[in-house]
Structure formats: C-alpha cells, structure tokens
Amino acid sequence: MKKTVSVLLGSAMALMVVTSQVMTAYACTGVIIGKDLTEDGSTIFGRTEDLEVNHNKVYKVHEEAEYKAGESIKDVSVNPDNGYSYTFTHSSYRYTSVSDTTPEYGYFDEAGFNEKGLIADMTVSASANDEVLSVDPYVDGTDTTKPVGITEAIITTAVLGNCENARQAVEFIADEVATKGAAEGNGLVVADSKELWYMEIYTGHQFVAMKYPSDKFSVFPNSFWLNECNLTVGEEKENYNVSSDGMYIYSKDIFKVASDAKTLKGDEASRNIDLYGSYAGELRESTESRVCSGIKQFKPDASFDGKVYPFLQDTTKKITLSDVFAFTRNRLENLDKVADDMSRGDLYPIGNRNTMEAHIYHIPKTATAEYPGTMWLALGSPLTSPFVAYYPNQTAGIPEAQNESNEFNEDSVYWLAMDTLFMIEYNREQLQPIATEKINALESEEIKNAVTTMMSAEEATALNQKDAKKALETLKEIHSEIKEKFQNYIKENDYTIHFSGKRATAPFTGAEVRVPKDSAEVGMKLQIKPAEEEGSGELQLVDFYGNPVTEVKQELTYSIPTSALSGKVAFFDGEQEIASEVKDEHYVFNTKAVKISYKAGSAEGSAETTAEESSAATQEKTENQAESSKKVPNSVLLIGAALFIIAAVQMRRKKSQ
C-alpha cells in the first residue's frame, strides 16, 4: 500500500517528529491459492494491509448510486488540485470496502465486493527500476502540466463502483493507465465467481495482467513477480493487447520501454519477456524475508537459491483457510529466525506490527455472480484480532467494526486489537500465546459455521453481526487478560526500549533506554525530535500513542550512538546538564528526566549555550503535568511535513514495504 500526502509547509521542519514506531514503507503481502490446491476446492486470495500503527481501518457498505452518472470522483492523495479523476458513465454499483478513516488524504477503499459479484483487492505497492522509469516515468505530479495518474487511493473505488466482472475490471484499469497514466507501481487482484486476474502496473503506462491458473499458488510482497511470459498478439485493442491464448492483457509498449531502457530480458520477435528481470527494482531484504516465509507456509520443503522467486508455485499440500490465516501471522518461525519488526531488514515478517487489517477471500466451488464468496476480515493486527466472515450482500457491520475514531477507543475493533498488540510486544514470549490460543479456538468454530451459499441480505447481516460480536467479546477477554499480565510485568521486570530510526533519525538507530521495574504505570517508547538547527533536538518518552510521559519513578539509563552526533555533545534536563560518558561507542547517562534536549558542536561554550536555549523546555515541562490520555496525536501530519521538506515536493507513504 502507498499513501501520498502533499502539504504546504513554510518552516515546518522544526515540527518534525519521528518516533520509535516509525512508518513502514512498502510492507503489504499478498497471496493467491488456486482451487486445485485447496482442501475444499475453493479459490483463496487476500492480503495484509501494512503501513503503520495507530491508523484506523473500518468496514463500510456503499449504497447503489452513491455516485451518480456524470459525477466525478477525484484523488487527493498526491495533489488535491491536480489529482486523477474518474467520471461515472452510470450510477455506481453497491459495494463494500475496508477503508481508511481519513478521506481528506484519499479514499483507500482497499478491498470489497460489489453487487455484480466482482471482488477487488488493491494494492501491493512496488516500484520499477530507474532505467525503465527514465523512459516511462510515473505520472506522479512531477510534471505539473499533467494530472496525476491513477493511484491505490482511488483505484478500488473506481473499479468496484464501475465494473461488473474481473475481465472488465482489468480492461478498465488497462484503459485508465494507458490513457491517464499511473502515479505509482502496484500489484493487484480482481476476481469473480469464474476467474481471477493478477495485474502488475510497472511504470507510467506499462502493465501486464495474467488470468491466474487453478493449480498454482503465489506469495507477493512488495515487488513485481511475474517472471517469463509469452505475450503473443492475439487481439489488438485501442489501448492494450490480448494474448492469443487469452491468458494475458498487456500494454502495447511493454517490450519497447524495456528495450529503450536497455533492461529487456527476453526477445520481442518470439514475444518472450522476463517481466521481473526487465522491470523490477532491486529486491529488498524485508521483501525476501516475507516471500521466503510465505512460500514455506504452503510448501514446507521449499528451498531458495538467489533472488529470483518463481511467481507460480507448486505444492503437494492441500491448503485450508486456517493455513492462510496463519500465513498473515507468520513471524519467520518456519525459517527458524526471530522476527524484527523495527529494522525492516532480513528479519521483517509478514505478521508485523504495522498491519492495519488483513482480509482473505474464499470463493467456493458453488460460487455464483449473485454470491461470489466470503471475505474474512481481521481489523487491526491479525496477531490479536480474530478473522470474521463478511458476506457480499450484508447491509452493515457491527458498530465496533465501523467506528471511525482516530483516537484510541475501546468500542473499536481496530483500536482494541492494536492496544493488545502494543502490550504483547513487551513480553511476546509469554503474552502472545494467550491471544493465539483463544483466536485459534474461535476461528476453528467460525470456519465450521460460515455459510458459503446464497443468503438474503437480512440473513447475511444477522450472521455476520452475531459472529462479529462473538469475536469482539473474545478480543475483549484477550485484552483484559493481557492488560493485567502486562501491568504486572512492567511493575516486576526491567525492560529496554529499542529505537529504530528512519531518514533524519536513521543515525539514532540502536539507541536504547533501560527502564527499571516499576518506573511508570504505562509502557514507554522513545521519541526523537531533531530540531531545525543541525545537531540539536529532543529525546522524549511517550506512551503507545505518542502522548508524552510526564514522570518516572526511577532513573533510566539512556544509550545514544556516538555516530548520531558529531563534535562536543551535551544533554540537558531543562537548564541542568546531565553528566554523560562514552561507553562502547554510545553516550550513556542516567536521569529521571522524560524530556531531554541535546546539542552537538565543537565550540567550548556550546554546553552553556545549550543550557540557555533549553530554559524554555523547563517551563514547558513544568506546565505539562496534565494526565496523558490514550489519544493519537498529530504525529502523522508532523511526520508528513518533515518528510515533505526532505523530499522537496511531497512525502510518499507506502504500505508494507
């Protein structure tokens, strides 16, 4: 998933806030299981939607004619004034979605059914290599004379509101990308009761869609994955070609752009092309860790050699819904590794802390256009949130699944699941099994009770709400039990806060704060705020949601990498300098201060100057003793502003790696 937020800043760099809960760019993981490989003969596919913590997701129902014929929808995610727009040629179809709660940044409807039996799951973010982008760049607003191309923020809304089946959806996207361009690279899935298509959008105008075979499975985190394809010319449409076997729909210049970029792996004369080799960017370690663990989830004997992974995989295992649920929770156990959510390196798991929701579609053998299947949805992290069956024609979800609050709220499935996860992270070994055991027991029962045949809208709504309420009660039980054990844990045990930074705070990666037992009644994180002046800034202790911690009972031990700051460095609690020493290439100091200013410089008087500059911080600290509530601050906007300055034009937020 990608998200783009454009902001007018002025001197907003001074407001930059980057916390230890850094945003994850490029982190979604998709999966497709062909019907020949499943235990019940169904087709299964879905995705984890990953970006960041404290980002609410809700289930929605959009009624027929929400958008009238002749009415336009506009994408504001990249440029509010010059974004992609689509004008409906007919009133929009009724559709469901799993949506963001900040429409001012874009629709991001992500996944859903429509009344015609179409299913859309969009998108897994990816990016092409620099060579092909130099030939056919993304239509991302860099050229201000052209409207921005289509993005993840609006594509699902346009497709579900407009298209009747999977083939038509692919053709619609092909036409839009060919004529209006794409602002970003993406992988996506559209399906109906008869067929499933997987599509990759590579550059500003190049794409390939493949009708998915029934005897394969695929795992696709953030990259392009289609390997060698035979793109023959069967039928030539105005904006795309259809292969002679009907298996591919592709852009007319798919060979030419790669050839002009000198990246073509293949032969245009024989119509063979290795799309991964020709168009994909470098494979990231965090992508490799997820594709390897994901493949082994369904093919335990899989082995890997090099960085090329066949998109179409075989297995002798008969795969179940439970297996796919487990896939969304995979934390590299099958690779005998311990996952690391923060570094986003080779230990980054599918089941990471940045998952905002996960959805799995189950298309049974009995599927029809009127009743194409079931969506299993876990709002919040599936590590703590049970999957619940949602039906194509239901009219509403439970209020807790539709609660659009952007602050912590116990009457929200998303927020309750994430609050539970935050506590688990302090003692995963002991606390995660509590959630896992209860969730597995519930889901096993729910899978048995799910209905895969036609129901009335009233019946479907009632069944979903009954199951969703039961899942919510289970989540509340998990939250209550873990909260009690968590509070006992931080009261009776020391723990260490580990900081992992990004961009401006990347040099601070490896910073730690050692917290003695019973130091505070809340779990704490380290937040770093670089100031506009180079080499200065603040260290702040915050709770799960970025709210400042007002005091601690014990002295904490801070350890800051010396490589993060150059020259003479001083740390201050208000006006008072904190004595520090260098140990193992870290500045180490002890203090009860929860807000610390730092100043790096070579001048002898730098420490004195910093003390004067920090007097304002003392005043603020005195005034800031109000009780901290569980509330999401405006840190998302501040981060967006800071990264906008760094990028000079805009900040691009991308889902799950």
Task: Please place each PLM-identified region on the residue numbering.
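Proteolytic processing hotspots in large secreted/extracellular or virion-associated proteins
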Residues: 502-503, 529-570
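Substrate-recognition/cap regions that form aromatic- and gly/pro-loop-enriched pockets
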Residues: 337-460
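Intrinsically disordered, low-complexity repeat and linker tracts
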Residues: 1, 13, 502-509, 513-516, ...
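A contiguous strand-loop segment
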Residues: 28-151, 172-301, 306-309, 314
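C-terminal segment of classical bacterial N-terminal signal peptides
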Residues: 15-25
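C-terminal membrane-anchoring or membrane-association module
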Residues: 643-657
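Histidine-centered catalytic/metal-binding microenvironments
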Residues: 432-501
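Proteolytic cleavage junctions
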Residues: 502-508, 512, 521, 549-550, ...
